[in-house]
Amino acid sequence: DEKRLSRLIANLDILTGVPANILDVTGRDIRLFSGHPPFCRAVNACPEGHQRCVACDAWKVGSYRGDGGFQYYRCHLGICEALMPLYSKDQPLAWLVFGCYLDESPLEEQWARTRTRLDWWPGDVEELHRAFLQFRQYTGEELRAYAETLESLAAYIRLEGMIQSAEQSDLQRLERYLDQHYMEKLSLAPLSRQLH
């Protein structure tokens, strides 16, 4: 239910100021959130920057090694982000991400790390530096509290069935068949053909 998901993501940003988003199973942004910080908007406005961000999203999904909770990392430019799968049974259907923040280490150190990764940037690095300084910094305690809140939200998303697999289970196919044929005389042969 894209509309409800979009509203939840927007509400999180309003309440916390921390951008959250949903990526599809391959790590592609499904465009539920458009309020990225100025630094990220500037990088994404550059074709090479956008390509690097897309590749980074795919990388973080492919390298997830968590236990179902959030895995924290720094993106290709050193900005802090976190990722967790939204499961159906044992398979991720989508990914819940939050990020575009800085940790509590000194800003100068974080900028120095980012600056070393900008040799490809075609524009004025000082403009990016000014945008970088607009990132909010969060303590570990704040991030844990936010992650716990998002984990509860992830459980709600699963419970409400807001994200569905395109592939239907046997039970879902059976329910659909019964819904469509409830007025007919049922027998096992046609039912079995429909399920397999």
What are these regions (language model features)?
Residues 56, 61-113, 135, 142-145:
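Sensory/regulatory domains in signal-transduction proteins
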Residues 29, 89-93, 186, 195-196:
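Solvent-exposed, well-ordered amphipathic alpha-helical segments
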Residues 2-79:
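Structured interaction and signal-relay segments at domain junctions
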Residues 1-16, 94-167:
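Juxtadomain coupling helices with adjacent low-complexity linkers
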Residues 164-186, 190-196:
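A short, Lys/Arg-enriched amphipathic alpha-helix from helix-turn-helix/homeodomain DNA-binding modules
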